Amino acid sequence: MMHDDPNEAGLPPHNDAIPDETAEGADEVNPLHHRRIRSFVTRAGRVSTGQRRALDEFGPRFVVPYAPEMPDWDAIFGRSAPRILEIGFGMGASTAEIAAHRPSDDFLGVEVHEPGVGALLKLIGEQGLSNIRIIQHDAVEVLEHMIAPASLDGVHIFFPDPWHKARHHKRRLIQPPLVAHLASRLKPGAYLHCATDWQNYAEQMLEVLGAEPTLENTAADYAPRPDYRPVTKFERRGLRLGHGVWDLVFRKRAD
């Protein structure tokens, strides 16, 4: 997810891991694994003193260790509630804001970058949020091993790395195998919400999501920004400069 000031965190605006060029061959084994953790190197980002303190203080409660097994999410959250998965929450400002405004929903954020995890934990502590849990691991493996079929009420993927060069488009997160896997984890009627500020990526998202037979678009093409998704300072700056932002909201078909 895009965060308010990426430069302060030592991270670029689009906060995905960077594939290791030498590991591209691993992608050919299973197309779903185009974001496998062994094919990635994380961008170097400085963990601030406040983030480190939050990692130490709140990590034991709110960070769920990755394990290749299905956890008891009701026990982890301490209740049974609608569950939303967010892939790549960046520095977590929007995640915290959404969770604060939707206290009856639970949010599971997946992020590989430690500064972002620390930043969100800091917000959790400052705001007294209890409906967020974090996994610091590759999202594909989390999806495969820790999320049961038809168990999610929603998925958020906000401002993933656009990989704007044409030769890098195959590295984009929104690809047919991943979308099919995400759709399999959604309950009937649950939603998948993507957002991007790159028109070419928005067009690809629309094509890929529209081709998934178990999903249906909630709009003719792009959706109005739902009220629950906040506009970040970084996004607002882009809008002032005339940059577009595209939201796509699809739902899992009931049949």
Curated annotation (Swiss-Prot):
Residue stretches of biased makeup (Acidic residues): 18-27
Enzyme class per UniProt: transferase
Keyword terms of this UniProt record: Methyltransferase, S-adenosyl-L-methionine, Transferase, tRNA processing
Protein's UniProt keywords contain Methyltransferase: yes
UniProt-listed PROSITE patterns: SAM_MT_TRMB (PS51625)
Region of interest (Disordered), ranges: 1-31
Positions that bind substrate: K165, D197, T232, K233, F234, E235
Binding site for S-adenosyl-L-methionine: E86, E111, D138, D161
Catalytic activity: guanosine(46) in tRNA + S-adenosyl-L-methionine = N(7)-methylguanosine(46) in tRNA + S-adenosyl-L-homocysteine
Its EC number(s): 2.1.1.33
GO molecular function: tRNA (guanine(46)-N7)-methyltransferase activity
Metabolic or biological pathway: tRNA modification; N(7)-methylguanine-tRNA biosynthesis
Entry's Gene Ontology cellular component terms: tRNA methyltransferase complex
Active site (catalytic residues): D161
InterPro entries, per database record: SAM-dependent_MTases_sf (IPR029063), tRNA_(Gua-N-7)_MeTrfase_Trmb (IPR003358), tRNA_methyltr_TrmB_bact (IPR055361)
Function field: Catalyzes the formation of N(7)-methylguanine at position 46 (m7G46) in tRNA.
UniProt similarity note: Belongs to the class I-like SAM-binding methyltransferase superfamily. TrmB family.
Protein name: tRNA (guanine-N(7)-)-methyltransferase
Source organism (scientific name): Burkholderia cenocepacia (strain HI2424)
Native organism taxonomy: Bacteria, Pseudomonadati, Pseudomonadota, Betaproteobacteria, Burkholderiales
